[in-house]
């Protein structure tokens, strides 16, 4: 599914259209849908790995039209390593997808408000919660 990027991914501010593909119940692939761009990310469903909750800032709710949305997805960027147990997840900057309006954006959480989330956490660090 194609999404309009309303709040860009940090470091990729020039990308305005992205394609999301489901791999399985836990993993997804996000790639640029623009010509001459080969940007691609592996995403993970954070709720499959740990307890995960945060407040979406009001400006982001407005930009992504979340108030009326019925189908919303939260996913996190994952850096895949070999073996998979060495992979890391960015819990401090989740991506939010509004499937109803095909809008997406990245929210950067305040590390003071969410000290238990980090930019690079081992994928297995919360498997026993």
UniProtKB/Swiss-Prot annotation:
HAMAP family: FliW
Disulfide bridge partners, by residue number: none
Keyword Cytoplasm attributed: yes
Name of the protein in question: Flagellar assembly factor FliW 1
Function field: Acts as an anti-CsrA protein, binds CsrA and prevents it from repressing translation of its target genes, one of which is flagellin. Binds to flagellin and participates in the assembly of the flagellum.
Gene that specifies this protein: fliW1
UniProt cross-references to InterPro entries, sorted A to Z: Flagellar_assembly_factor_FliW (IPR003775), Flagellar_assmbl_FliW_dom_sf (IPR024046)
Family statement: Belongs to the FliW family.
Pfam families xref list: FliW
GO biological process: bacterial-type flagellum assembly; regulation of translation
Subcellular location: Cytoplasm
Record's subunit section: Interacts with translational regulator CsrA and flagellin(s).
Keyword line: Bacterial flagellum biogenesis, Chaperone, Cytoplasm, Translation regulation
Keyword presence, Chaperone: yes
Cellular-component GO terms for this entry: cytoplasm
Gene3D superfamilies in the record: BH3618-like
């Amino acid at each position: 599914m194609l999404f309009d990027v309303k709040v860009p991914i940090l470091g990729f501010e020039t990308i305005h259209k992205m394609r999301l593909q489901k791999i399985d119940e836990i993993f997804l692939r996000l790639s640029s849908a623009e010509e001459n761009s080969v940007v691609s990310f592996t995403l993970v469903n954070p709720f499959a790995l740990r307890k995960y909750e945060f407040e979406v800032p009001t400006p982001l709710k407005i930009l992504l039209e979340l108030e009326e949305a019925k189908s919303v997805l939260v996913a996190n960027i994952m850096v895949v390593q070999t073996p998979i147990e060495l992979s890391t997840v960015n819990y401090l900057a989740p991506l939010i997808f509004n499937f109803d309006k095909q809008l997406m954006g990245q929210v950067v959480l305040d590390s003071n408000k969410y000290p238990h989330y980090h930019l690079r956490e081992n994928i297995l660090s919360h498997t026993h919660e």
